Amino acid sequence: MSEITSITLPVPIDWSTKSKAAEEHIKKLKDVLKHPHNESNYISALVEECAEELIPNRKQVASYWEPYLMGELTLESFFLEWLTYTPTTLSPGKYIEYWDYLVNTQSGLILSNDAYFKPWFKDFLNFHGDWINSTSSTATLADWMKFGGTKAHPFNIEDYERPDPTSSTGGFKSFNQFFLRNLKPGQRPICNAEPADDVIVAPCDGGVFYLDRGSAPGNTEEVLSRDYDLPGKSDRFDLLEALPGYGPYFLGGQLLDILLWFTDYHHFHAPVTGEVIHQGLYEGSYNYDFGDYNPEDFYAPKLPSDSDKVGWYDKLGKHQRYVWIIKTERFGLVAMIAIGFWGVGSIVNAIKDKSKVEKGQYMGHFGYGGSSIVLAFKPSLDLQFKVGEKPVEGPDKPVLMEVRKCLGKRMKPFSW
């Protein structure tokens, strides 16, 4: 697997073919809110969010929602603005960020999971996806062509193919085409470390960190009862929930997460060579919890007594995700989980059932939004992970890496 395979960019649509239906759908929100408790839960969510103005990192969000609480703006107007929002370099996730804060209040969680509201919201996100894939969504592309990223997440458009490099928009006909851009030939060469069969490569671009370094107790019951705690946070990751059926096989093993930023290459590739013995899409929520809850902060939001809401990773398994179980000769079963955050409309799989994959091979891509790839390994393996000379550490210290680069290696058993 020497070169990365390019994908065909999605054909852009004419927004005028969707706009009327999208606006009519938003008007239906009034009827959705008339169902029992929905309007009161919406108002309660606004009250809860605006009450957090004393929390330093919530003051700006509380100020944003205050006009809605005062009746100066409506939820319908919020979704109308979001519908045709094209991500900017300064605020790529503007509306989903504000929305996530609101729906992760106690009342907001009830509203977002209501039997009437939830399907309405998913349909709304699909309409927003139509906008992102339309020829009307190119207004910010010139800024993205000049964007150099941030210190934490550098970006260079020169790494990518552009339909027309001489154009200020790169020749992309929709924002979605830009988001799903292909790498230029020769970019992201595959790791050539030896012995090749013992090497794991990066499945995607992004910041990699451990969710668990692998410390399985000898007692099986103890293993099955363990949570994956994030160091320095109050968050937990429930692998059994994120990986239905196969979860117990990986409990106690090394567990890595790679978080993709908006500017990252959003295609993902096989980390190992093997046979895909199971794959499937698991539907989940279209929201997640932000990880800024601090139980030691006097002004931190109070958790309801019946809630396990402690941070965004605690809800990770509830998000839409695609799971592959790969059978290998050297690593046993390896799990790869593609998780969609930030209103990701689709996780596209390119692998057929029961097919063999080669390390570094293209396996699929994310639609627009925030995304994450989790890799899970069985506990009996002695694996070491690093990016270049930088060892992989905990979630507070993600290490930037590029797809198909050397990531991990199985170590030989010690012997005299």
Give the predicted meaning of each segment.
Residues 1-416:
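Contiguous, well-folded functional domains in the mature portion of proteins
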